Amino acid sequence: MASVSSKIFAITGGASGIGAATCRLLAKRGAATLCVGDLCSENMKQLENDIKEINPNTKVHCTVLDVSSSSNVDEWIKDIITTFGDLHGAANIAGIAQGAGLRQAPTILEEDDQQWKKVFQVNLDGVLYSTRAQVRAMKESSSTNPGDRSIVNVASIASMSHMPDVFAYGTSKAGCAYFTTCVSQDVMPFGIRANTVSPEEVEETYKKEGFSVIEADDVARTIVWLLSEDSRPVFGANINVGACMP
């Protein structure tokens, strides 16, 4: 079983879907604290109740978080360090999708500027802001409390499939994967690992928009493994879940 016992984790997009599944599994496996950041507060109370039922010893700290704001992300991570004193791992799962098969060809003509920017602000800028703040906190904490630390960024199998559609989504997720691999080489000397998970699409919303789907728990197991000590030799990987790489 992947070891995450007694550790502190930050999860963006953690109140629903893959993020909530990751939180539940981390609690089941003994995580000390889960710091959840999500733009939508609707599911936070339910998540807190779920975690309490799974493991009453796991603390849950929920924050309304806009990952497209670097200052918002920086304050969130600073608050985690101030409140809990450390950060052992992070999963950056917050993201937004585009509907596939909804536009007439050539679909590039309907890829408008506003939609492009919105998708990139969350799916790529948000990953940059979150990863940067987490690395800063982990580097500072590891100087006084050394140990293996891990960051997992969630991209998508769509980043590899070269679909003639959803250009902003696929391109932003490809950027996420490339960025994470580069960061992994940068931070490994400081005892920080960075990896990517690229799942097939998850949940009914995406199914209605033309994607095949897998369960959130399937993706969560891979994320938690990468956050755990069991994956210590692994860094710079991009692991596909639920579908073969094209």
Swiss-Prot record:
The active site is at 169 (proton donor), 173 (lowers pka of active site tyr). NADP(+) binds at residues 18, 66, 132, 169, 173. GO terms for molecular function: oxidoreductase activity, acting on the CH-OH group of donors, NAD or NADP as acceptor. Pfam families: adh_short. One of its GO terms (biological process) is protein homotetramerization. It catalyses: chanoclavine-I + NAD(+) = chanoclavine-I aldehyde + NADH + H(+). Its EC number is 1.1.1.332. Keywords: Alkaloid metabolism, NADP, Oxidoreductase, Signal. Pathway: Alkaloid biosynthesis; ergot alkaloid biosynthesis. It is an enzyme of class 1 (oxidoreductase). InterPro entries: NAD(P)-bd_dom_sf, SDR_fam. It comes from the Eukaryota. Residues 1-20 form the signal peptide. Chanoclavine-I dehydrogenase; part of the gene cluster that mediates the biosynthesis of fungal ergot alkaloid. DmaW catalyzes the first step of ergot alkaloid biosynthesis by condensing dimethylallyl diphosphate (DMAP) and tryptophan to form 4-dimethylallyl-L-tryptophan. The second step is catalyzed by the methyltransferase easF that methylates 4-dimethylallyl-L-tryptophan in the presence of S-adenosyl-L-methionine, resulting in the formation of 4-dimethylallyl-L-abrine. Belongs to the short-chain dehydrogenases/reductases (SDR) family. Homotetramer. This is Chanoclavine-I dehydrogenase easD. The lineage of its organism: Eukaryota, Fungi, Dikarya, Ascomycota, Pezizomycotina. The gene is easD.
